[in-house]
Structures are given as C-alpha cells and as structure tokens.
Amino acid sequence: MNFDMSKLMQQAQKMQEQMKKAQQERENMEVIGESGAGLVTVTMTGKYDVKSVSIDNSLMSEDKEILEDLIAAAVNSAVKKVEENSTASSDIHKMAKDAGIDLPSGINFPFK
C-alpha cells in the first residue's frame, strides 16, 4: 500500500474547510418553531439563540399555564428543527468521502 502523507494532509484540509463552512451555515440559519397550530411561534438561530417570540392575540385571554406550555412547546419545536438541520454524522462522512477519505461506517461523531 502506497501512503502519500501530503495527499492525506490535503484531503484533511479540504474536509476541515468543508466542516467550517457547514458550521458557519448552521450559525447563520434561522428556524421557526411553533405550537398551538401556529398561534405561538419562536424564531431561533442555529446557535440556539431565541430571536423572537410571537403570541397570537387570541391567546392573551387564556390561562397563564396554557400560554406557558405553548411557549415551551414552540421553543422545543425550534430546538428540534435546529438539530435536524445541523451537520449530522452522515454529513461528515459525506464530506470525508468528497475529500477522498473513506471513513468506516461505524464511526459516529459527537458534534453537530
């Protein structure tokens, strides 16, 4: 087997650039979580920062606990969407393959 260290370093650098780009895309994304059929919405960034909360006026006369539950559900919905849109382990395997690195399928990465 012929081992070319410079080629491996180039491939690793390419993969690192792709991962950095994916991380920047995640940080720049915004998702909207909702609950109560859209009566409560939460806009969240890929860094899990809540940018806005919108509550339909029809809920303003509701019980405080109901409103709190709807807000919590909307935040949880937004968190789930950020996680679904984040760079997953399978995306890292694809980046590695694009860089010419064949990772074993059993390797999972703990970061997103």
Curated annotation (Swiss-Prot):
Disulfide bonds: none annotated. Residues 17-27 have a biased composition (Basic and acidic residues). GO terms for cellular component: bacterial nucleoid; cytosol. NCBIfam families: DNA_YbaB_EbfC (TIGR00103). Homodimer. It comes from the Bacteria. It is found in: Cytoplasm, Nucleoid. Keywords: Cytoplasm, DNA-binding. Residues 1-27 are annotated as: Disordered. Belongs to the YbaB/EbfC family. It comes from Francisella tularensis subsp. novicida (strain U112). The keyword Cytoplasm applies. HAMAP family: DNA_YbaB_EbfC. One of its GO terms (molecular function) is DNA binding. Binds to DNA and alters its conformation. May be involved in regulation of gene expression, nucleoid organization and DNA protection. The keyword Cytoplasm applies. This is Nucleoid-associated protein FTN_1196.
